[in-house]
Amino acid sequence: MKKKALALLCAAALTLGLTACGNPGGQSSNAGSPSGTNTVGSSAHTSGQNTDFPTKNINLIIPYSAGGDSDNMFRCLESSMSQFLNGNVIVGEIVSGGNAIPGTQQALDAEADGYSIVIAYPGNICIQPNMGNATYQYSDFQAIANITASPVLFAVQESAPYDDFTGWVEWVKAHPGEFTFCTGSLGGTPHLAMMKMLYALGIQDDVVYVPYSGNSEAYAAVAGGQIGGYAAVASGVVNKEFVKPIANLGTVECPAYPDLETLTDVGVDMSQATDVFCGFACSSNVDKETVNALSDAFAKAMELPEVQENFKNLNYTTNYLNAEDFQAYLDENYEAYAQVIQNLDLTQ
């Protein structure tokens, strides 16, 4: 009964015509490229820099668990940054828990001088402020640089009677109410990505959603046969036993599964796709020259072959955006998530 109530909540609230959360329109050709390649180029470097910055180490708040995507992304860059920061380093500090709100707030509480920055992820920057859970506002932040983009993948039980996205859609339509899916959190990026897809296909009433508390629990439920499928960022699906990915719900190619069907293959416009960005942000009160100096340092590090190799080895797709382009990308994502969250009645 609880499962059906959750499904009806989603069905009653969400409407079609959702704005893209993936590749933003109206940007330069380097911004938000869905090609799956590193987009560092001439537009990556910014002008008006503070050339004296930094004069000491920079503290990076990672508001998610150690070993997670945001932590791993930073580790790919960590050892290469000092050569572009006047010999100083970025020190990562894990402050996890509370839907990433406490750690994100900690970065804001520090002096707005550019020496305290935070991982910028859809959850802490766009989703939590829209849901009304955060102790801060979206406008409290400004973008520094984006580093990676990852699609949301949809996987099902390995023994399922369909092997691709098209087959799954046909099966769901023929068996309304029988398919269950889960994600690691209610209102998280994978959940919202699935709901956009379901409504675009008109099958939102034919499936039942079950929220879990964490990606590992969601995966275990599907691998163990209790739930039909789950949606997660690519790293939560790649190389997992007893499940099979059948769809890429984003615009960015997943290197581990380059031939996965996308929304286009089932007749849905890619404006309904959802990609997961991971970058850096800081207080909106930090001066632009300092922000540009940080953005340029990340751009230079991203050009290094060893850094690119680090990301490749972890199946991350690099997608550098400078401060200006990343800000535009964040703005579009914030508005898109606002609409989805409002339609799902997930605001607190």
Predicted features and spans:
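Positively charged n-region of N-terminal signal peptides that target proteins for export
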Residues: 1-5, 9-10
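C-terminal motif of bacterial Sec signal peptides marking the signal peptidase cleavage site
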Residues: 17-20
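N-terminal (or domain-start) structured segment
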Residues: 22-26, 32-140, 178, 186, ...
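An extracytoplasmic/periplasmic, membrane-proximal ligand-sensing/linker region
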Residues: 55-57, 200-205, 265, 288-348
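Stable alpha-helical elements in mature extracytoplasmic
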Residues: 69-73, 77, 99-103, 123, ...
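Hinge/capping helix and adjacent helix->loop/strand transition within the periplasmic-binding protein
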Residues: 81, 106-115, 130-217, 263, ...
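Short secondary-structure boundary segments
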Residues: 121-122, 158, 233-235, 250, ...
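Short beta-strand->loop
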Residues: 139-147, 208-210, 236, 241-273
